[in-house]
Every structure is written in structure tokens, then in C-alpha cells.
């Protein structure tokens, strides 16, 4: 899944672009600022996981390039599944348990949703846990200790998790004094490292500009120490937080319940018969459901990865302890059926409490869309291959991960001293509005300092020309413009017409109270907020659409200029870009016309979301063709 997502240009700057840059950086013995963060990777996460695999970079990366980290992560997931199987086989020679645990491991919902995050430290670090438990069970304590150290240094939450893992191991190995001694030692080591981590090591990485920002548990306290004190002083309130919505946003009322239900049905019910295995889930469930961010509470993205890594082992160790064979087989079947049912059910937007946290294009493997891309993949890869490995590059969200293994990579529209810019015209920076992104792209497309060297729609590659001698006053070959000043009315059906005779608006909204150019405008009030939907047929013969309108309004973000192309492309503008001497504000909405839209038609409309009336005049729609075509 991860390999295909990357190949089809679905991996994102957050996180895979940052991870690829950090991996390259570590492999070249550097510690640099990552593309989307004001600090280095170690300041974002105190983890050495990527450093473990620097030798793999030098062995494999010449061949696998930006796919290397995905290959490493997938290999660790498979290795973790293999060690989970080996542990179950230690406890039982029942062939159904062995087959069942492998099947179950890859049926759980969280195994699929985790791929929406591409590569993540949580996924990597979790894979060490079954490996450690296996070597602990077979009494290879030195090897287990080595895995413990790798685990502790892999992510900040691991030391606390290991304290509870060792408690379960003490219960499980209670007749083995040597095992108990090692487990108690493990608790002490984990606790000491956890204290040192937050008291010494993490503060050492902080600076005036960058502080550690991943302990987000305001309901408990500002630090792990404060959180522990709160839970000891207010145990009932702390337990309540595991189940209630403490965000004060009713949207997330049932998110925690959904998480518990999904994994209870997906085999977790078995643990009710062997509750000792619930113990090692306590810290990883707490880190989810007590967090300030409600999206972490539920079943979104990789936020359940620790659970789905340990749940197969827990469920099948519990099943292995059942005495009767028919009970074991029944439990295996029920767990696997529950898992596959919940996975298929919850990979559908309509079946989730918070639908927007699902990215089906990256995780819904049984959908045709999972195997398609918005790009001409081969053509875009050829385009990217022309960029020198040493060049400084500014790239947009889904392009950057493919170019991140270099000394200087920037997240467009941050250009700095870049020699190349490459972006998709639909690849918006999430912190900017659509029109802010559009204006940034057009600034460079129309600049005489940047040459469009290649393009494979919707991707453009630009090269910097420091002399600024290029003659690129316009990138368009032709433009078809229609206008409406709300003065021309059809005698036949009493509708307001565009300059080409097409219908623009109904006369019900016509007003003479205000006008910008002549005597009429249309009035949108609280009684009639919406203008007519204007259909723009056969628009795919053009490349670019620009809609301009003037409005007289009093409130901020009161006017909304909206356009749709098919079901999947929606564009919006509510901020004016200029104002004339009479107080009329100009709003512009522009976008590249999708080549793979579900329809050949686009449409537009204007609406008023405010409490006061607005007046609309001088509507202009411009359709353009690109010179390069």
C-alpha cells in the first residue's frame, strides 16, 4: 500500500517528505532544519529510529531512492507479524492459531488507516515490541535487552509503554524468578529513561525558537509529572476522561466510543476472558483518548497503530489459553470476521463519526480509485528526473516527497534560493486559501525570471533564470471573455443576459438601489442569499478559468464566489483582492480546469452569508488556453 501510494503521488510532505529529508540528512551525518518545521527532526520527535537504518540507505538507496523508508517500514511490519506468529507457536502447536494470527494481523482496520500517514515513527517503533516479547519468552535476555534499548530510543512513548509490558510479563512468567528479576529491572530502566527523557534529553534539544510540542494533555497537566499527580489525586475524574468528550466540541461526542467498539468487535472481546492482557494497552490507549486533539481519540490514520500491533498477540495468546479446541476455533473465526467486518465498514466515509479523518484514496484497497492517479505518473517521473540531485528545489505537497533526498528542499510557495520550482496546480499549501495558492503559482508562471521547462498537466517544472531575460508577458494563447453588467434583459423570458446572449441571472434579484457601472446590480439579502447557478458548458477545451465580480458589502468574508467542476473539484473565494474609489470590492476566483472531471461542465454561483444586503455588479468570466499546449 505504501509503495503504491508513493508511486501514484499520494505521499505528502507531512510526513513522508520530512521523513525522507531527515533520513537523507542523517545518512550524510547532518542534522538540518526540515522542510516544514522551524527545527530539525530530533526537535520534532526525540527518536533515533531513522538513524538505525542509515546503513540500509547506503546499501539500498541507490536503487530504491525515496521508496527506501517505505520498504524499511513494510519489512518491519512483516517482521513484527512473523514474531507475533512465533510467540503464539511457543504457547500452542494448534495450526489454526498460527494461521489465524497472521490473517488477523493484516485484517485490522488500523493496519490500513496507518498508511494514510505514509511512514511514521509510531509504526516503526511499535514493530519492535513483538520482537522483544519473543526473545524475553525464550529466555534470550541479552538479545531482548538489545531490542529494549532500540525500542526505548525509538519514540518518546515507548518507555512508559514498556513499564506496563513488563507488568504483564511478570504476571505471565510469575513462576520464573529469573524472568521476574529481569522484568523488574526492565521497569526500573524504562522508568528512569522516561524521567531522563523529559527532564534532561528533550530539554537539551529545545531552543528559543523551538520547544517540545508533543505532550498535549491539558486535562491532566502541562508535564508528565503533573499528569501523574493529577491521576493519583483524581482517579475517578481521570478514568472518566477515557470515555467522555473533553474538547467541548460536540462533533467529537462519540469518537472514543467508536474506537472502543471497533476494536472490541475486532477481536478485543476475547481479552475480557483474559484481562491481564488489557494491562499493556493502558498507556497506549491513554495517550490516544486523553490527548487534546480529538482526532487522535478515534480510528483515524496511524493513531491506533500501537493497538493493532499488540492486539493480535494479545487476542491469540488469550485464545491459546482456552482449554477446549472448539472454543479456540470459534474465537478465531469470530475475531477474524469481526476484524474484516469493521475494516470494510469503517473504510467507508459514511460509517465514521468523523468522516473527514479518512483518506480513502490512500487506504481503501478494494476501491478502483486506490489504483489510479491524478497524474500521468510516467511523464511526471521523467520530468522530475531532469532535476539534478544537487539542485535546490521548491516543491508542492505531493511532489516534495519524491525530491526530498537532497541538501536544500523547500515546501512551495516557500522558494528562497531554489533553482527549480515544481508543483501541481491542484496541490495547495494547507495553510493558505485556494486563491493565495493560485496567486503564488501564477506569480512564478508569469515571471520573466522563471522558465517553464516542462509540464505534464497538472504538474509544471520551472527553472530559475537569474538574468530575467525571458519574454513571458503572458502564458496564454487566447482568452474567451463573457461579461454581465446586469443591464441586458431578455424580452422572451425576462432573464438577465451575458454579453454572448446566455442567461446570467433571474430578474427577481435585479436592483437599482446601487450600481457600479450603469444603473442596475443584483441584490442578495437575508431573504434571497443565493444568486442563480450559472452553467459553463464545454469548458474542458480550455485550460484556465477566471471569474471576476464586484460587490458592495459591509461585512468581512460576506461574499462567497463558488465554482464546481464535476463532483470532485470545488473552488471558493471570499476575500476581495482590490477596492475602488466608490467602495466596491473586487473578488476573483480562478483555477485550472480539471482534465479528468466527471463532467464536461463547470458551474458557478454567488452567495451572501452575512446579515446585511450585498450588491453584485460587473460579472466577468474569462476562459483561457495555455501557450504550451
Could you describe each region identified by the protein language model?
Residues 473-629:
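Extracellular and organelle-lumenal recognition/adhesion modules and their flexible linkers in secreted
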Residues 160, 278-324:
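Hydrophobic/aromatic-rich transmembrane helices and adjacent perimembrane loops
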Residues 18-27, 39-64, 230:
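Short hydrophobic/aromatic helix or loop-helix immediately within or flanking a transmembrane segment
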Residues 245, 254-281, 285:
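Hydrophobic, aromatic-rich transmembrane alpha-helices
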Residues 161-191:
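Perimembrane helix-loop-helix junctions
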Residues 83-86, 107, 122-148, 165:
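Specific aromatic-rich, kink-prone transmembrane helix
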Residues 47-54, 66-83, 98-131, 153, ...:
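Aromatic- and kink-enriched transmembrane "portal" helix at the membrane-lumen/periplasm boundary
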Residues 96, 184-191, 322-354:
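Signature aromatic-anchored transmembrane alpha helix within multi-pass, membrane-resident enzymes
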Amino acid at each position: 500500500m505504501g509503495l503504491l501510494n508513493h508511486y501514484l503521488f499520494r505521499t505528502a510532505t507531512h510526513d513522508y517528505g520530512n521523513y525522507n529529508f531527515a533520513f537523507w540528512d542523517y545518512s550524510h551525518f547532518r542534522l538540518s532544519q526540515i522542510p516544514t518545521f522551524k527545527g530539525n527532526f530530533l526537535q520534532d520527535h526525540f527518536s533515533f529510529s531513522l538513524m538505525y537504518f542509515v546503513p540500509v540507505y547506503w546499501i539500498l538507496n541507490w536503487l530504491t531512492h525515496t521508496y527506501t523508508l517505505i520498504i524499511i517500514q513494510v519489512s518491519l511490519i512483516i517482521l513484527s507479524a512473523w514474531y507475533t506468529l512465533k510467540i503464539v507457536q511457543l504457547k500452542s502447536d494448534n495450526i489454526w492459531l498460527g494461521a489465524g494470527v497472521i490473517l488477523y494481523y493484516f485484517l485490522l482496520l488500523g493496519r490500513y488507516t496507518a498508511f494514510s500517514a505514509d511512514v511514521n515513527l509510531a509504526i516503526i517503533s511499535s514493530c519492535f515490541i513483538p520482537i522483544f516479547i519473543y526473545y524475553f519468552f525464550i529466555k534470550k535476555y541479552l538479545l531482548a535487552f538489545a531490542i529494549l534499548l532500540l525500542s526505548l530510543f525509538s519514540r518518546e512513548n515507548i518507555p512508559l509503554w514498556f513499564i506496563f509490558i513488563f507488568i504483564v510479563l511478570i504476571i505471565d512468567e510469575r513462576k520464573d524468578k529469573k524472568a521476574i528479576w529481569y522484568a523488574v529491572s526492565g521497569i526500573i530502566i524504562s522508568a528512569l529513561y522516561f524521567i531522563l527523557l523529559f527532564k534532561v534529553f528533550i530539554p537539551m534539544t529545545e531552543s528559543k525558537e523551538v520547544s517540545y510540542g508533543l505532550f498535549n494533555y491539558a486535562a491532566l497537566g502541562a508535564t508528565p509529572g503533573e499528569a501523574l499527580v493529577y491521576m493519583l489525586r483524581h482517579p475517578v475524574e481521570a478514568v472518566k476522561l477515557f470515555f467522555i468528550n473533553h474538547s467541548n466540541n460536540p462533533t467529537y461526542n462519540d469518537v472514543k466510543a467508536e474506537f472502543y467498539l471497533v476494536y472490541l468487535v475486532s477481536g478485543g472481546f476475547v481479552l475480557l476472558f483474559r484481562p491481564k492482557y488489557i494491562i499493556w494497552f493502558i498507556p497506549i490507549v491513554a495517550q490516544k483518548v486523553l490527548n487534546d486533539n480529538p482526532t487522535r481519540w478515534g480510528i483515524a490514520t496511524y493513531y491506533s497503530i500501537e493497538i493493532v500491533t499488540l492486539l493480535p498477540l494479545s487476542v491469540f495468546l488469550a485464545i491459546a489459553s482456552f482449554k477446549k479446541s472448539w472454543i479456540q476455533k470459534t474465537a478465531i473465526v469470530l475475531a477474524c470476521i469481526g476484524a474484516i467486518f469493521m475494516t470494510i465498514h469503517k473504510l467507508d466515509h459514511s460509517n465514521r463519526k468523523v468522516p473527514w479523518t479518512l483518506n480513502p484514496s490512500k487506504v481503501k484497497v478494494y476501491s478502483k480509485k486506490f489504483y489510479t492517479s491524478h497524474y500521468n505518473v510516467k511523464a511526471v517521473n521523467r520530468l522530475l528526473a531532469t532535476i539534478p540531485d544537487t539542485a535546490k528545489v521548491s516543491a508542492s505537497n505531493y511532489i516534495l516527497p519524491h525530491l526530498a533526498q537532497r541538501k536544500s528542499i523547500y515546501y512551495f510557495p516557500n522558494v528562497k534560493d531554489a533553482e527549480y520550482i515544481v508543483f501541481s496546480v491542484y496541490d495547495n499549501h494547507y495553510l493558505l486559501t485556494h486563491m493565495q495558492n493560485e496567486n503564488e503559482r501564477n506569480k512564478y508562471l508569469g515571471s520573466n525570471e522563471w522558465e517553464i521547462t516542462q509540464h505534464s498537466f497538472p504538474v509544471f517544472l520551472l527553472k530559475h533564470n537569474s538574468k530575467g531575460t525571458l519574454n513571458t508577458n503572458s502564458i496564454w494563447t487566447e482568452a474567451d471573455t463573457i461579461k454581465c453588467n446586469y443591464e441586458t434583459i431578455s424580452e422572451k423570458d425576462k432573464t438577465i443576459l451575458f454579453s454572448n446572449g446566455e442567461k446570467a441571472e433571474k430578474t427577481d434579484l435585479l436592483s437599482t438601489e446601487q450600481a457600479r457601472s450603469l444603473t442596475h446590480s443584483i441584490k442578495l439579502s437575508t431573504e434571497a442569499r443565493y444568486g442563480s447557478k450559472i452553467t459553463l458548458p464545454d469548458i474542458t477545451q480550455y485550460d484556465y478559468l477566471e471569474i471576476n465580480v464586484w460587490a458592495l458589502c459591509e461585512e468581512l468574508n460576506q461574499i462567497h464566489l463558488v465554482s464546481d467542476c464535476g463532483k470532485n473539484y470545488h473552488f471558493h473565494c471570499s476575500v476581495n483582492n482590490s477596492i475602488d474609489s466608490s467602495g466596491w470590492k473586487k473578488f476573483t476566483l480562478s483555477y485550472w480546469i480539471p482534465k479528468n472531471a466527471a463532467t464536461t461542465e463547470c458551474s458557478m454561483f454567488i452567495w451572501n452569508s452575512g446579515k446585511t444586503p450585498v450588491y453584485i455588479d460587473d460579472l466577468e468570466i474569462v476562459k483561457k488556453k495555455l501557450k504550451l499546449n
